Amino acid sequence: LDLTSDDHIIEIGTGWGSFALHAAKKYGCKITTTTISNRQHEYVSNLIKVEGLEEQITLLKDDYRSLNGQYDKLVSIEMIEAVGYNFIQNFFETCSRLLKPNGLMAIQGITYHEQGFENHLKSVDFIKKYIFPGSNLISVNHVLSVIKSYTDLSLVHLEDITKYYAETLKLWRNKYKDCLLYTSPSPR
C-alpha cells in the first residue's frame, strides 16, 4: 500500500487493533477503523489510550455500510469472510465509494477454490458451521466479476498466501500453548 504519514486510511473490520496500531506507529498514518464487535471495540479503545494514539486512530463502532467520507487507502483483513456471498457487491461498492480517486485498497481474506465454489454455496461444511456461521466464503473469480461489473476498482496485485497458512496456524498454536503455560496456576 506504500503507506506514508500523509495517508488517511479506513479499515473495515478492526479486529484486535493490530493493523491500526502498526500503521500509526510505523508510518505515522491517520486511521479510521470500524468494528461491530463490542468486545473488540472495548479492547482496542483501551489499547489506543494505553499507546497514546488517540490523535492518529479513530475507532468507530459502526457497520461499514454506514461509513462516509473518502480516504487515501482502504484495508480490510480477514473480514470479507463475514460479509457473505449475497453482500459482496455491496461490500465492494462501499469500498469504491470510500476511496478517493486513485486510492489504494488491500483486502486479505480466505477464499474458496473455483472448482467447488457452486457446491460450496449450496452446502453447509465445517467452515460454515463452526468458523463463519451464516456466511459463505467467496471465490477470487466471483470477487473479480463483482469488481468489474459494479465498481470503478481495478486489480493491481493478487497474491495467494495459502502456503503460509499452515505455518501461521502452527505459530498461533505454539503461542497459545505458551500463554496457557504462562497463565496456568502453579502446582501445589
Sequence positions of predicted segments:
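Conserved class I S-adenosyl-L-methionine
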Residues: D6-G13
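Conserved small/polar residues in nucleotide/adenosyl-binding loops
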Residues: Y182-P187
